């Protein structure tokens, strides 16, 4: 309250702040008690104390960060004094009128840090002061953030083993809560039934679908919108507002409620394209009571998401694609596969509204040799991999965006190729969000040779010719060169369908080639205006 900063860690500029003094700790504890009392006055039944993830209470408990020589350092009992001071202050103020859920890292997952054994010992000290032991993991001050907030390379429930260890210790007698990329009700029930926890929590899963618990309760698990772990929700500071890739209403629920009007009559809606944007449009139009027909030229739905079936770390995208496909069927959308839409065909259907979701094409940069027989696009790479076609052992990927990085990992991790990736800019996957990018780069370092600040000057049957800003030249041997240099919207193809109905709107990649979030947002917005 005096405006001075205190910390145990070095901030982003390398500056060290003074350590907490006992009087400051006492003021902080009193502030926690004030907040608890305010919560009680507002009608809350429970509060959560965040004592994990490298935050200040976690720092005090960590032998790696707490190197104090006074009464608050050294033994676990000493390191626990500040958290206990806070819990005592809260209990003295509100008694047992509020439940306290205490969040703690079951392990910091770092050398010399807080361990699961430390966690159990601490919980033994405080279990008479709290009501729920909430077991998370990791720390912001180690390279574990992408495990603490599980990324798409990790399985669902990946951190549940820590809560299970706490439960199996038989030393903790209060309910134990686990979390970590849970969303499927069956996995939650199994975790509880096998003694892994008493409670299971979701965070991102209730952002992608706030009604997920209610849907599970009423036997509608198939309608739960699956989280794809893209972290657009957590990294919203980079965007204009809090958002979710798979639920376009998140962060703007109130505004949409004011703007959206129920349709005055049932209309005949034609959607062209069965990728995520087209399927979202068809779903929303059907939910609004319209008659919807979706035309897709391929023999399957999903668009480019279909390739997620080939890559384990894209399982979350496969889950979302399957959800959309299932909901189209459940909502009664007529789907015509292997049907290439033409203006004449669509006009004959006498639509009241047309939504074009015709996608995008790979950018083919003007590089000598780019049309050689050994050059393929990322999409063709996945198709060849699925068909088992030979691409050789040495493969070069041109482009270090998200598509290029994921394609390189697919080739290296699943097809066991020797992969080299080149990127003109200073880093790879720069458009990705911080936590998934951390996991992505970790895997690239293990499986792929990456060169940044390098451009391709030509492609020959022997491989890729490259140069850097210093004038150095080299040839990267490659049997196949994979292009991942971006996507170009099929805007012209989409415009062919304008004028066939009173309402027309292009959506998804044919407007701007972006990502799942852009696809679902534009698809939702278009259909909600019909």
Report residues per predicted region.
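Short, ordered loop/turn segments at secondary-structure junctions
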Residues: 51-54, 66, 138, 205, ...
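Local beta-strand N-terminus motif with an aromatic residue
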Residues: 44, 130, 197, 328, ...
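Flavin-dependent oxidoreductase catalytic cores
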Residues: 1-272, 276, 280-292, 363, ...
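Rossmann-like dinucleotide/flavin-binding elements
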Residues: 263-295, 336-350, 357-371, 379-432, ...
């Amino acid at each position: 309250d005096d405006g001075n900063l205190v910390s145990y860690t070095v901030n982003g500029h390398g500056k060290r702040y003074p350590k907490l003094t006992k009087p400051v700790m006492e003021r902080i504890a009193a502030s926690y008690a004030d907040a608890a009392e305010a919560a009680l006055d507002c009608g809350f039944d429970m509060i959560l104390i965040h004592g994990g993830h490298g935050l200040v209470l976690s720092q005090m408990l960590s032998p790696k960060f707490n190197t104090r020589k006074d009464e608050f350092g050294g033994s676990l009992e000493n390191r626990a004094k500040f958290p206990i001071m806070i819990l005592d202050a809260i209990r003295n103020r509100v008694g047992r009128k509020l439940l306290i859920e205490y969040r703690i890292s079951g392990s910091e997952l770092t050398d010399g840090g807080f361990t699961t054994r430390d966690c159990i010992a601490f919980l033994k000290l405080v279990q008479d002061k709290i009501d729920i032991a909430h077991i998370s993991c990791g720390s912001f001050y180690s390279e574990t953030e992408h495990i603490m907030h599980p990324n798409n390379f990790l399985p669902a429930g990946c951190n549940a083993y820590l809560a299970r260890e706490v439960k199996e210790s038989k030393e903790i007698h209060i309910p134990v809560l686990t979390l970590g990329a849970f969303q499927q009700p069956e996995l939650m029930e199994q975790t509880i039934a096998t003694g892994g926890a008493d409670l299971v929590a979701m965070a991102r899963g209730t952002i992608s679908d706030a009604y997920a618990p209610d849907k599970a309760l009423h036997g509608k698990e198939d309608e739960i919108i699956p989280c794809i772990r893209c972290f657009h929700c957590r990294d919203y500071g980079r965007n204009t507002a809090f958002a979710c890739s798979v639920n376009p209403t998140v962060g703007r629920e109130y505004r949409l409620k004011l703007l959206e009007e129920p349709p005055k009559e049932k209309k005949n809606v034609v959607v062209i394209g069965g990728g995520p944007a087209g399927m979202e449009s068809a779903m929303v139009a059907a939910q609004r009571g319209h008659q919807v027909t979706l035309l897709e030229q391929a023999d399957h739905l999903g668009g480019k998401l279909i390739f997620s079936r080939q890559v384990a770390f894209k399982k979350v995208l496969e889950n979302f694609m399957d959800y959309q496909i299932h909901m189209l069927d459940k909502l009664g959308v007529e789907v015509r596969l292997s049907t290439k839409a033409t203006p004449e065909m669509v006009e004959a259907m006498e639509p009241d509204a047309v939504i074009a979701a015709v996608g995008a094409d790979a950018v083919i940069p003007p590089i000598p040799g780019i049309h050689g027989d050994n050059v393929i696009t990322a999409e063709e790479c996945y198709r060849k991999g699925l068909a088992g076609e030979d691409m050789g052992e040495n493969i070069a990927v041109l482009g270090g965006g998200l598509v290029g990085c994921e394609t390189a990992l697919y080739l290296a991790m699943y097809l066991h190729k020797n992969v080299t990736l080149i990127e003109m800019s200073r880093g790879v996957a720069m458009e990705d969000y911080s936590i998934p990018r951390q996991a992505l780069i970790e895997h690239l370092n293990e499986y792929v040779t990456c060169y940044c600040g390098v451009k391709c000057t030509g492609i020959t049957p022997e491989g890729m010719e490259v140069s850097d800003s210093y004038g150095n030249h080299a040839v990267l041997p490659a049997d196949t060169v994979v292009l991942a240099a971006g996507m170009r919207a099929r805007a012209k193809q989409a415009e062919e369908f304008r004028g066939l109905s009173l309402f027309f709107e292009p959506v998804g990649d044919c407007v701007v080639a972006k990502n799942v979030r852009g696809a679902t947002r534009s698809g939702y917005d278009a259909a909600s205006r019909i």
